[in-house]
Amino acid sequence: DLRTDWPAGLWMYKWAHSTISNGVLISEPTESKKTINRAIAGFGRCDANWFHFNIETLPRILSASGFTEIGVPVLVQSDIPQSAVDAIVATTGREVIKINSDFLQVNELIVSQAKSATMDSVFLDAVNGVFTPASIASVRESLLKALPPGEGGNKRIVLLRQGSYRRIKNIKKVLSVLKEYGFEFVDIGSLTLREQIDVVNN
């Protein structure tokens, strides 16, 4: 079952169908427009989401990069933000190739299993619970080594995100009160990785 057994985690490239209750439909190419000899799989669940990318996708990329020779690129989904691309380049030094609607054939795809990263749910068994402190600490160390913090910014910040889920019903009132106390509002997803580090360096 590709929905649960795919080695990279939850398989995102599937479509629901009214006549299929326990299966998935996968678009299979009839021909390849481009071929790459080797590449690291740098995609997973909700990669365009800043939270999911940092605790799930990036640790798996770092894991695979650790035992793969220099020069092998990282494949990512085309919709990930520039800050995510910056993070991959800064921590691995590898070329990042965005996968668009064209089909790409990879002769050898290097996949780091989902259990090598922290998941945001208990979909996979985790010895230390939902969050693995060692995994998060490793990602933090890699990022700060590649991009050391600069000058500290405002001590009072509110991290905002664009999205239609898990919204605060009275967000306008909340922001109004926070503004009175001198908080700065930051859409973290719109910043580059360098800007993200500087914003929270306080």
Mark where each language-model region is.
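The feature primarily captures lumenal catalytic ectodomains
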Residues: 1-202
